[in-house]
Amino acid sequence: MDMKRRIHLELRNRTPAAVRELVLDNCKSNDGKIEGLTAEFVNLEFLSLINVGLISVSNLPKLPKLKKLELSDNRICGGLDMLAEKLPNLTHLNLSGNKLKDIGTLEPLKKLECLKSLDLFNCEVTNLNDYRESVFKLLPQLTYLDGYDREDREAPDSDAEVDGVDEEEDDEEGENEDKEEDEDGEEEEFDDEEDDDEDEDVEGEEDEDKVSGEEEEFGHDGEADEDDEDEDEDEDEDEEEEESGKGEGRKRETDDEGEDD
């Protein structure tokens, strides 16, 4: 895929001004030059052109906010003066795997006042005697060369990233986490409300069961009392009948005695 088409795909319906990172690794550059990249990418902070067959960076547009440029595994042998002119705020530059042979080719980088990290792995220039001392002397603004400072201390991982880009990504991640936490909190609160409603329903059912039990018990007692009253009435009637029978018996006996007289 050629570089122009790759840039078009990477835009993803965005305007160039909305792009902050652009990765064009392994695409093809015609005549070894940058093409399709314009000054409209005014907010671009990270540009990667690894293994695209570049010979020259002369077509590089002015990118005032670019901080990190990846140019490793190309065929660049010079012409670095364009970098200082077009990328005034560049802090990280990777030229590893290019055809840079002597310290003189690096001299234009002196004008990159913000440059603090430079990588030249697998370039012939690294084979020169006193290579590191010479580069640090040539570029006093430099903090790290090939991942190490003047005292051979390794650069922290944070220095390998673009300042600002990562901070914004961290902010976005933080906002997403806060949003997720808020959503989780709302879900938990909703669950608690549901649990409370369920508890109230259970308590209501228990109260209803209790009332029903009391009514049922009361109902049984009432029926039992009515049965007892019926039995008492029957007994009273039997006693009255017996007394009536006894009275009639006495009357008959009295009548019989009168007849005998």
UniProtKB/Swiss-Prot annotation:
Domain LRRCT: where?
A: 123-161
LRR repeat segments: 16-40, 43-64, 65-87, 89-110
SUPFAM superfamilies recorded: L domain-like
Concerning SMART domains, the annotation shows: LRRcap
Q: Which InterPro entries match?
A: AN32, Leu-rich_rpt, LRR_dom_sf, U2A'_phosphoprotein32A_C
**Record GO terms (molecular function):** histone binding
**N6-acetyllysine: modified positions:** 86
Where composition is biased (Acidic residues), the residues are 157-243
Q: Which residues carry this modification: Phosphothreonine?
A: 254
Q: How does this protein assemble?
A: Monomer. Interacts with histones H3 and H4.
Give the UniProt family note: Belongs to the ANP32 family.
Its protein name is Acidic leucine-rich nuclear phosphoprotein 32 family member B
Per the UniProt entry, what species is this protein from, by scientific name? Ovis aries (Sheep)
